[in-house]
Regions:
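A short glycine-rich, His/Asp/Glu-containing loop-to-beta-strand
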Residues: 81-89
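Catalytic core of non-heme Fe(II) oxygenases with the double-stranded beta-helix
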Residues: 89-162, 189-201
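Short proline/glycine-enriched turn/loop segments at secondary-structure junctions
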Residues: 7, 99-100, 172-176
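Residue-level preference for beta-strand/loop junctions
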Residues: 79-81, 104-106, 163, 179
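Catalytic core of Fe(II)/2-oxoglutarate
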Residues: 143-222
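Short edge beta-strand segments in beta-sheet-rich domains
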Residues: 14, 82, 121, 178-182
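Non-heme Fe(II)/2-oxoglutarate
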Residues: 1-78, 97, 123, 199-212, ...
């Protein structure tokens, strides 16, 4: 008879990864192409939403970090790329924060902190995606990872935070005396994934497809 032991199963958890980058990224401190935190949802095209294309070595460092957890933690044998990426600035005081939001058209998202931060720099706060699945409001005597409806992380230099893009998050009020800088990014799968009628191949949309079927050459407009 197998040994019987009580277990805790963190089923269907939304994992947030707190990683550190062993790479000199001080060049980002000289880049002034910021998007203000409060304006990230502005509906306008901006080449600065692909800022990591200006830093291909750094882009690959972040991508390697994500690929490692995708393969080792989630057992995903897929290719990924960084789609959008942008520098953010959050000013001190009133208005120095962003509203809760999440990222569409993205699988995972990330934030990298490349500056030295004050103790009261605005934290990144994550909200539970299960908010509307609970009918009771019961307040615990001590909050922890198992009972919290939100969780905060304070920025640290060289810290990379990766999380599912569906997680609502925000920058809390920045109470420091100097601007708070970060680099945000989104990850998407590329290549072929899915199955049957839910199959997607991103090559279909880039012109990387087979030649026209000769059977179709006889079709003509009626």
């Amino acid at each position: 008879m197998p040994e019987q032991q009580d277990r805790f199963l963190p089923l269907f958890a939304s994992h947030v990864f707190q990683l550190y980058v062993d790479y000199d990224t001080d060049a980002l401190l000289q880049d002034k192409r910021w998007i203000f935190s409060a304006n990230q949802d502005m509906k306008r095209p901006d080449e600065n939403y692909r800022i990591l294309e200006k830093y291909p070595i750094l882009r690959d460092v972040f991508l390697d970090k994500f690929n490692k957890l995708a393969k080792e933690f989630y057992a995903l044998d897929h290719e990924f790329m960084i789609s959008t990426s942008w520098l953010t600035i959050t000013e001190p005081g009133e208005g120095g924060q962003s509203q809760h939001h999440f990222h569409k058209n993205s699988f995972f998202s990330g934030v990298y902190y490349y500056d030295d931060y004050e103790e009261d720099a605005g934290e990144i706060e994550f909200m539970t995606p299960l908010e509307y699945h609970s009918d009771f409001y019961l307040e615990p005597v001590d909050y922890n990872l198992n009972n919290s409806s939100s969780w905060r992380l304070s920025p640290q230099k060289n810290m990379l935070v990766l999380f599912p893009s569906y997680l609502k998050h925000k920058v809390n009020e920045h109470k420091g005396t100097k601007p708070r800088y970060s680099l945000a990014m989104n990850f998407i799968p590329v290549g072929e994934y899915g199955t049957s009628d839910s199959t997607v191949n991103t090559g279909w949309y880039s012109g990387d497809t087979d030649k026209e079927d000769p059977l179709l050459q006889g079709f003509r407009k009626i």
